[in-house]
Curated annotation (Swiss-Prot):
Top-level lineage group: Bacteria
The entry's keywords: Ribonucleoprotein, Ribosomal protein
Lineage, opening ranks: Bacteria, Pseudomonadati, Pseudomonadota, Betaproteobacteria, Nitrosomonadales
Quaternary structure (record): Homodimer. Part of the ribosomal stalk of the 50S ribosomal subunit. Forms a multimeric L10(L12)X complex, where L10 forms an elongated spine to which 2 to 4 L12 dimers bind in a sequential fashion. Binds GTP-bound translation factors.
Name under which the protein is recorded: Large ribosomal subunit protein bL12
């Protein structure tokens, strides 16, 4: 019993204003929505979808070097490819972003390495 969208649109186009009003009321009752709320929901849906899509890339932020700064510098050098001075400056300047635009799995792995080295970090 599949009805094509074109058939539905054609039926609606042939309705009078009174019939359209009754159709809208029946749809509101059947689906438990109001016409005004449906407009807002449609406008908000693309923004929500965009927010979900953006969460495919994560950033790991070093919040504190901790007590064992040497180990933290070693981990930062290993994962970023920075030189000793650059890695030390990054660790000393916490909070700083260590890596950004990485997958959730990579971010979790990097966070684990930094925490094991004694650093404080978070994923955003």
């Amino acid at each position: 019993m599949a009805i094509a969208k074109a058939e539905i649109l054609e039926s609606i186009a042939n309705m009078t204003v009174l019939e359209l009003s009754e159709l809208i009321k029946e749809m509101e009752e059947k689906f438990g929505v109001s016409a005004a709320a449906a407009t807002v929901a449609v406008a908000a849906a693309p923004a929500a979808a965009a927010a979900v899509e953006e969460q495919t890339e994560f950033s790991v932020i070093l919040t504190a070097a901790g007590d064992n700064k040497v180990n933290v510098i070693k981990v930062v050098r290993a994962v970023t490819g920075l030189g000793l001075k650059e890695a030390k400056d990054l660790v000393d300047g916490a909070p700083k972003t260590v890596k950004e635009g990485i997958s959730k799995e990579d971010a979790e792995s990097l966070k684990k390495q930094l925490v094991e080295a004694g650093a404080g970090c978070e994923i955003k």
